[in-house]
Structures are given as structure tokens and as C-alpha cells.
């Protein structure tokens, strides 16, 4: 299957050209790269355990879509969680289906069926449920009728493209693990003339300021007078990994678009739009076979793009009527 992502990509002189990026489901990396595609790898099984009679309380909270398991443990240690009317101070507690749990005085909602969404994260939005600098976040622009969502990994303020979101904390953690074997691919605009031999050397990894970055597969797509477009694939996704590696090679990244995360593609998703992954597709990619997952197959939801341009003043109350509470994204590395 081939998806096409249409975008206007500008060079450093602001000359625009129409580009069509073909993203195929089996094009994960060039030959000199990771040894197998996701289809060739053994799928990492993910068990939902929807009918578990007893489980750790942090796991129960995460599966209710409130927050990640780690954040649930922190809330327990802060004394914000009660079980059957008693405040608990340790996450080392198993709870059953009949136990009554509250967080900050509010009853824990029933567990929703696990779902996954593809979201085109626009540039200029923070991937967080709240921002100390009062900048707008992705949650300020999500439709109100979505369930409580958290992100799978992050993208930094100036990055854009595919961001996976889920209502299940355990699923989010599972998809972030390097053991899934999934690569993340990006279209990268970098300033200057690109040395292809330097790109090839990244396949062996690189150490920058004491930080070891694993295998990076980078391919030059188009060299222009003042900048170039590349396709870059990574697996670890450390904090600002691609930007730091390109700066190490002497090139500043002026645009970064994630086009895939494992088998999930940006495809023709429009800037600011969100679309739920079909339950059977999600089940297949998680190795569940005949899935017990339930998910409504809603059409793509278009989101009002932020009505600001680079350098414009932005505020939490700009261009939206209110901020939904969606849960806390994981604090993993940004790209």
C-alpha cells in the first residue's frame, strides 16, 4: 500500500515547490540499515487483560486513561488516591474490579476500550497538557468529543507531523519501547550543502557530547542552492536527536516532519487533523490476531489550525473557547 503526503515545502529563500512524498508500508529503511521491516520482525505482543480480576492500582489508573502508570504512582505517593475511602501511600497495592478508587476526590472512570489515533501535530504547539510559559498546547486544539488522550512520545515545539495518541496508558508505554523494533521516519530540511558520506557514516551511530546515538539512516532526497531535503530514520528517539545530529554535522534543521511511526503513516492526513486507527489494524500491529478491541471508526476530524504565524504573540486563550482536560503525556524524548 502506498500513501502520498502532499505538502508545500519551502527553501531558505522562501521559494515554494510542490512535493509529493511516497511513503510505502514496506519502505522502512535503505539496504544499509536496520536488517528488517516491521512486517519481517516478530511482533511484540501486547495483552490488554481487560477482565483481570486483580492488578496493580497504578496499572488500573493508567488503563482508565487518566495518566501514565508512572504518573499514577506519583499521584499515589502524593496522597491523591483513595481505595474504598482510605488514602493509600504506596503503589504496591493490588485492586479488584469491585474496589472503589478516587483521584483528587473524583471517582476513577470505567476503563474505555483501548484506541489509537493519528494526529498531524502542527508547528508551534507544545506537546503537553499544560505549559508553564502559557504557550498553546496540542490539547487546546483537539476536538471536544474525543476521549481523554495521552501522547505516544513527543515532538518538540518546532517539529510537526505524525503524533500517535491513545486513551490507554499501558498501550502508550508499549508503543514507546525500543523493543517494538519500530523506526520513526522524518522529512528533514537542513541548511547548507550535504555531504553524503557523512550521512552514510551515521549508520554506525555517533557519540555527541558524551551521548551515544544509535543507528541513524539518512538519505539525501534533494539538494538545493542553500539547503536540502533528507529522509531520516531512527529507532531510539532521544531528546532532539535529529536536530543535534545535524548540528553536529554542521547543518541547522529548519523544518522537521515526522512521516511515520513504525507501521503507522502520516499519509494524507492534513495539518491539525486527527483520525482514529481502525481496531482491526491496531490489533494486527499489536499481534493480537482476532482483537477484542472495540473502536468506533469515525471519519477524520479536522481541527482549526492555530491562527498565528511565526513570531506572532500566542496565548492560552487565543482562537479557542476552552481547554479540554486530556491527561498527561509521557515525558519521553522529543525529536
Which residue ranges define each predicted feature?
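Short hydrophobic alpha-helical segments enriched in small aliphatic residues
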Residues: 5-7, 14
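Basic, flexible Lys/Arg- and Gly-enriched helix-loop patches that mediate nucleic-acid binding at interfaces
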Residues: 37-335
Amino acid at each position: 500500500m502506498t500513501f502520498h503526503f502532499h505538502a508545500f515545502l519551502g527553501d531558505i529563500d522562501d521559494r515554494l515547490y510542490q512535493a509529493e512524498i511516497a511513503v510505502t508500508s514496506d519502505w522502512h529503511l535503505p539496504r544499509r540499515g536496520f536488517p528488517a521491516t516491521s512486517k519481517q520482525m516478530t511482533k511484540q505482543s501486547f495483552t490488554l487483560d481487560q477482565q483481570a480480576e486483580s492488578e496493580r492500582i497504578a496499572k488500573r489508573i493508567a488503563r482508565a486513561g487518566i495518566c501514565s502508570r508512572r504518573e499514577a504512582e506519583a499521584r499515589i505517593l502524593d496522597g491523591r488516591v483513595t481505595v474504598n475511602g482510605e488514602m493509600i501511600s504506596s503503589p504496591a497495592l493490588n485492586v479488584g474490579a469491585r474496589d472503589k478508587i478516587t483521584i483528587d476526590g473524583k471517582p476513577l472512570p470505567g476503563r474505555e476500550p483501548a484506541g489509537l489515533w493519528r494526529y498531524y501535530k502542527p508547528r508551534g504547539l507544545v506537546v503537553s497538557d499544560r505549559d508553564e510559559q502559557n504557550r498553546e498546547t496540542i490539547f487546546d486544539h483537539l476536538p471536544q468529543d474525543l476521549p481523554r488522550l495521552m501522547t505516544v512520545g513527543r515532538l518538540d515545539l518546532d517539529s510537526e507531523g505524525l503524533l500517535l495518541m491513545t486513551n490507554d496508558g499501558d498501550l502508550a508505554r508499549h508503543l514507546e519501547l525500543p523493543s517494538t523494533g519500530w523506526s520513526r521516519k522524518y522529512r528533514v530540511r537542513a541548511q547548507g550543502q550535504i555531504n553524503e558520506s557523512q550521512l552514510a557514516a551515521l549508520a554506525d551511530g555517533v557519540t555527541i557530547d558524551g551521548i551515544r546515538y544509535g543507528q541513524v539512516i539518512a538519505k539525501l532526497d534533494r539538494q538545493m542552492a542553500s539547503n536540502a531535503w533528507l529522509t531520516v530514520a531512527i529507532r531510539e528517539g532521544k531528546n532532539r536527536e535529529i536536530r543535534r545530529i545535524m548540528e553536529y554535522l554542521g547543518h541547522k534543521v529548519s523544518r522537521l516532519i515526522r512521516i511515520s511511526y513504525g507501521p503507522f503513516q502520516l499519509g494524507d492526513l492534513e495539518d491539525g487533523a486527527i483520525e482514529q486507527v481502525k481496531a482491526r489494524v491496531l490489533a494486527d500491529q499489536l499481534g493480537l490476531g482476532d482483537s477484542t478491541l472495540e473502536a468506533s471508526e469515525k471519519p477524520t476530524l479536522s481541527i482549526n489550525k492555530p491562527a498565528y504565524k511565526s513570531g506572532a504573540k500566542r496565548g492560552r486563550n487565543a482562537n479557542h473557547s476552552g481547554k479540554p482536560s486530556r491527561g498527561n503525556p509521557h515525558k519521553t524524548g522529543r525529536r
